[in-house]
Amino acid sequence: MISRRKLVLGLAGAAGAAALSRALAPGLPRDTAARRALKLPIAPSGWPFPGARVVAPAAVFPPGFGVRRIYLDAGHGAPGNTGNVSCFCVEEQEFTLSAARALAERLNATGRFEARVGRTGDRPLPYAERVEDAARWGAEAFVSLHSDVRGRIDTWSPAEGRSCPLSLAAPGFAVLWSDEGNPALGARRLALARAFARRMEEAGLLPYGGAAYSGLYAPDAAQPGVFVDRRPQDQRIFVLRRPSMPSILIETHHALDAREATRWTEPATLDAFAAAAAAALADALGGEG
């Protein structure tokens, strides 16, 4: 198990890497997972290290854009489906509800959107009910928020007496979509997925390369971080293929990467993501009418 002290050294970017190198000098304990952290590729943006800067992309709203209804699905929280458990032992359903509420508040503050969080957390909510609710409400886009788990899993102790899963090898976001069904609706889903990934990358977030997705999702040739559902037909994601409006699923980050999970608790990251979402929705919905 990796101690919190050793991992924190690895979270601090270049300074942390130097400190971790000293900690791993000959004669001192050598933790294999901690050593691997030194070899992680660092994206030009530096994400997900603490010093990496995030920015708020500017949204361009065309004349007549009006106020658009956006249904925000806080992923999981369905009967018997709590989602993953993060590197801080937080259930995915708790993270997604918090993230969806934060996004709704920020989108609504623009005056350009009426964003609604479909799940309140008071009871497990089946996905079919969410899709029906979005249609009844007249949502123009369905955005499902999640976190992902990838790669080889170690364990660490973020607090005394607690053991949580950890994996530092595959940070980044992914935007999933489905080409199943009506081709015109599929084209609108793809446009929405590409707009979100493009604007999230512009905000300074890292698109995931997809190494762990082989056989599950196929990468988009035009936009990094976008993947189409290629699971067996009976296992494909319900909220990507059933809504009558364009729908996407955003794997916001790698829940087992302590650097990235920490960044997603920061107001600056939530602000940048909300700005990217507003810009993406303006891009994708602004040309429709």
Q: Each PLM stretch: what is its role?
A:
Residues 1-289:
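Catalytic-site microenvironment of enzymes
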